[in-house]
Amino acid sequence: MLHLAQANVAQQRAPLSSPEMGELVVALDPVNRIAERSQGFVWRLRSAESHGATTLWEGSSHVLVNLSVWESYEALHAFVYRSPHGAYLRRRARWFTPMRPPSTVLWWIEAGERPGVEEALRRLRHLRTHGPSPQAFTLRRRFEPDGRPATRQRLSRS
C-alpha cells in the first residue's frame, strides 16, 4: 500500500519569534491538531520547537518546512482547502515572501515510511529541475501510485 508524502517550503518574512509572525505561530498548533484529526492523515514532521515547525536557514533567510504523509490525494486536498487551514493559506503573503516555484512537492511512499527533510528537499530540487514526474509532482500535475499521470478530476475548494 502506498501513501502520499507532501512537503512544502516557505520563505518567512521574519523569524518565527518576531511579532509580525505572531498570528501564524499562534495558529500552528491548532492547525496541526486539525491535520492530525483529519481523515486520511498519517504523520507529520515535528520539531523540538514549541510550535512544532521546522525552520531551516537558506542563506540569510528563514525557510519553514512542512512535511506530512496522507493516505490519499483526496485526504490531503480536503485538509489543505476545506479545513481552517485554507483560511491561513489564503493569507500566506502576510508571513511569507515568494519563492522560486514550485514550493510544494508530492511523491508516493510505502505505507510506514517516514520521509525526512533531506529527501523532501531533494525531491523538490528534482521537481524544479525536471518538472512533474512520478518521482516528484505537484498538486495540479499529479501522478497515480502506479506512475500514470492522474486524470484531471475537479475537486471543489469549498
Feature locations, PLM:
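An amphipathic, aromatic/His-enriched active-site/gating alpha helix that lines ligand/cofactor pockets
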Residues: 73-101
